[in-house]
Amino acid sequence: MAVHRGSARAAPASDKVQKNKPAQTSGLEQGSRMARIFGFEWADLSSWQSVVTLLNRPTDPANLAVFRFLFAFLMLLDIPQERGLSSLDRKYLDGLDVCRFPLLDALRPLPLDWMYLVYTIMFLGALGMMLGLWYRLSCMLFLLPYWYVFLLDKTSWNNHSYLYGLLAFQLTFMDANHYWSVDGLLSAQKKNAHVPLWNYTVLRGQIFIVYFIAGVKKLDADWVEGYSMEHLSRHWLFSPFKLVLSEELTSLLVVHWCGLLLDLSAGFLLFFDASRPIGLVFVSYFHCMNSQLFSIGMFPYVMLASSPLFCSAEWPRKLVARCPKRLQELLPAKAAPRPSASCVYKRARAKAGQKPGLRHHLGTVFTLLYLLEQLFLPYSHFLTQGYNNWTNGLYGYSWDMMVHSRSHQHVKITYRDGLTGELGYLNPGVFTQSRRWKDHADMLKQYATCLSLLLPKYNVTEPQIYFDIWVSINDRFQQRLFDPRVDIVQAVWSPFRRTPWVQPLLMDLSPWRTKLQDIKSSLDNHTEVVFIADFPGLHLENFVSEDLGNTSIQLLQGEVTVELVAEQKNQTLREGEKMQLPAGEYHKVYTVSSSPSCYMYIYVNTTEVALEQDLAYLQELKEKVENGSETGPLPPELQPLLEGEVKGGPEPTPLVQTFLRRQRKLQEIERRRNSPLHERFLRFVLRKLYVFRRSFLMTRISLRNLLFGRPSLEQLAQEVTYANLRPFEPVDESSASNTDSSDPHPSEPDSEHVHSEL
């Protein structure tokens, strides 16, 4: 992996030499074959000196410079979007009572205006990196604010954000400004000069690790059996596959198995010359699909930009050489690169030869240690056991992408006054701007500590905080993630020790998933089901909404006692037994068996069913009137079905209003779906334009505040209102936008009625 043939000098033993000298030894033949395949000989690995010489071999800087430019350009696009510059004032507004989740509790956000300055420095650093202007300084200006913002909020961590920081860190130590850079125009030593081979080795090794470790992680049984991304095959991108395969087989064979094979093989396909063309086709198709399937920002495009790194280092020169001569004057140089002090040259290049210096040894050490560290970190969870829950480690550096999908059915936060013993309940997520705290013990501890500091403002003394969080991972039963009996404020947590109040994942119940799918498929369209598993000695307190007029509970395994709170009745259920639950009342389900219990709620939203029937009747009536089969006049309250709501006319009934709202929504969806490609592209551009416009205007306001002081509140309010305008969008679209598309934390959908909070 360390070396690529396209970046190496020609092997000393060529095919021509072998033909002229058939008596050559087999060792030389093997060596030349190895050089053709890997780009180096065994002799290059025979000693430390040879390895240093190999990794500092002079290499064309063109390919590296193209990646530098593309990566930095994508970071310029990323900063207002996924880094959150466009919504920075919503996240870090001064004076907010907000619980935050930094990696280290000592990390705190700066005042809002200073946070805008941090983002401005990061943006200027990315711009300088892209242009190759004051390159090393620009890399630092981007890198330090990036990692500060990254470590400030664990809830926004993901694998690709981590990868961006790693790539920026690597580029900081490289000579990526030796081609196609402003620094090259200002310094003859840097202009079109060689770079050491290790610059490519580190980047190629990083991308190889991302692919390969992601594939190894997908060897997990849940992925291989098709449970991780079970519903992804419903996306329109997989429609061609569903012409010959069922949706279930498309999910298993195309989404899961092909995804596994691609990740395992992508690095190898890109590395070898013979397989690289097919590798480029596969990974390009893969990342283009990902850009449509997931909201993952610039990640697909960064990976697309990294693919040419595996090609020969001089490919940009060959491309420039094929351009018209007039255009070549505006493009980077096509001449051969010059010698550089960063590289080690052999006697053929330097008369007296060259011995590696300290910088060459340091570059080699950095390469080897960095790649070893990247291979170790995804499996270092035995050291950071405090971050292990049902999945291992801090999410974001393990490359276990898309392996685990979660659904949260029920979240309840209970507080107890430490002096009076009074109980109360909090809305899940109160004082937070994220939802990821539900899945991680470290964040839950930070959240409980923060709540214990905020609740005294609301006359709660020495608060104790308890969490009851129910999660399903990869279509298993809904079960508790944390022990609801433990006061998390006083609970022990350490990053290096196992968290005792994390409940184990009930892996023994995994085979039930096939049965659960059969049960779901046997129900009609109006019937819903929720599968629950609970531990012995615990109970679930639940409320059945009045809308759920037909709700029952059925035991699948173990033994439970159901208490109807209002009726003060208890009923014990054994395997296969079921009972009806009254709507509009609380009940408790106690697990009394010695092993975990498994049961399911089966319910019908009778209110919704009745509404659907009424709306279907109105739709049928409207169609009959329009086609002439209904000749009688409509009553006044139903006239809006044909004419719409008329000012001054009779007030439509609530049912008719609901029908009209649905019709308008369906018409808008249909209009957007059938809109021409250029119209969709225009909407996309306008949304992005708003994000960048707001980012620029809010940054300008904050920098003005730092330089000249804050103006009056009235002026600030006017400036922010102007920044929030959408002057480029049609009036109907901009007014219909109830939420800002740049907000990275949209509101969480309501939980199912059957598991609403107390």
Swiss-Prot record:
Domain of life: Eukaryota
Keyword check for Iron-sulfur: no
Transmembrane segments: 61-81, 114-134, 137-157, 293-313, 362-382
Function statement: Mediates the vitamin K-dependent carboxylation of glutamate residues to calcium-binding gamma-carboxyglutamate (Gla) residues with the concomitant conversion of the reduced hydroquinone form of vitamin K to vitamin K epoxide. Catalyzes gamma-carboxylation of various proteins, such as blood coagulation factors (F2, F7, F9 and F10), osteocalcin (BGLAP) or matrix Gla protein (MGP).
Pfam (any one): VKGC_lumenal_dom
Coiled-coil region: none
GO molecular function: gamma-glutamyl carboxylase activity; peptide binding; vitamin binding
Keyword set, alphabetical order: Acetylation, Disulfide bond, Endoplasmic reticulum, Lyase, Membrane, Transmembrane, Transmembrane helix
Misc note: The vitamin K-dependent protein substrates of carboxylase have usually a propeptide that binds to a high-affinity site on the carboxylase. CO(2), O(2) and reduced vitamin K are cosubstrates.
Chain segments carrying region Disordered: 1-29, 727-758
InterPro entries registered for this protein in UniProt: HTTM-like, HTTM_dom, RmlC_Cupin_sf, VKG_COase, VKGC_lumenal_dom
Cytoplasmic side: 2-60, 135-136, 314-361
Modified residues (N-acetylalanine): A2
UniProt name for this protein: Vitamin K-dependent gamma-carboxylase
Lumenal side: 82-113, 158-292, 383-758
Species name: Rattus norvegicus
GO biological process: lung growth; protein maturation; response to dexamethasone; response to manganese ion; response to oxygen levels; response to parathyroid hormone; response to Thyroglobulin triiodothyronine; response to vitamin D
Catalytic activity, EC: 4.1.1.90
Localisation per UniProt entry: Endoplasmic reticulum membrane
